[in-house]
């Protein structure tokens, strides 16, 4: 998914203390006032990186989350796939520079993060802490026109350890998913 498509307006953004630090540095180096420094910084908008970045999000909890089923599933017809981080890394079949990491949850009004284009992609507001997120990100070098998503080939045999169905799913859905697993020769537990 393109990182700019998430509902959270803070997704990929820089926290307030980072912005304040940048403004102070620009004022110091350029010898200008605060408004001029903010104007200069607006040319280096982090949203440009966010709109060119693709992410894949995983929950790293040891158990299912009712909150996540509720948040991300509009009906009882969906699945959750389990994997291990090493399997996820090995399953992604691309030569592009893929980054992996746990999300750090912060207060965007008081916490500062490391500088650079990657750290904003691995920090979220404390209110999302229940997601317990692990993220995979990819910033393609040659993507001039951002899209909603990007195809990245994966080895599903390495990737999928188990498939979970939502607690509200019906028997027919269990049967259907079992048939899909059998048809595509997916070696995993259901």
Regions found by a protein language model. Name each.
Residues 1-190:
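Partner-binding and oligomerization surfaces adjacent to conserved cores of proteins
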């Amino acid at each position: 998914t393109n990182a700019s498509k998430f509902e959270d307006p803070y997704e990929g953004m820089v926290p307030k203390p980072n912005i304040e630090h940048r403004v102070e540095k620009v004022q110091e180096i350029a010898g200008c006032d605060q408004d001029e420094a903010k104007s200069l910084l607006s040319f280096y908008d982090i949203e440009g990186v966010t709109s060119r970045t693709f992410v894949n999000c995983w929950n790293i909890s040891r158990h299912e989350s009712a909150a996540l089923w509720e948040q991300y599933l509009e009906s009882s017809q969906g699945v959750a796939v389990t994997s291990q981080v090493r399997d996820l890394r090995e399953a992604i079949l691309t030569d592009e520079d893929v980054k992996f990491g746990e999300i750090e949850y912060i207060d965007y009004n008081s916490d500062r993060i490391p500088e650079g284009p990657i750290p904003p992609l691995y920090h979220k507001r404390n209110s999302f802490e229940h997601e317990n997120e692990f993220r995979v990100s990819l910033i393609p070098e040659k993507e001039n026109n951002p899209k909603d998503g990007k195809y990245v080939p994966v080895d599903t045999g390495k990737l999928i350890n188990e498939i979970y169905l939502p607690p509200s799913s019906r028997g027919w859905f269990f049967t259907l998913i079992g048939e899909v697993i059998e048809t595509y020769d997916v070696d995993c537990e259901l």
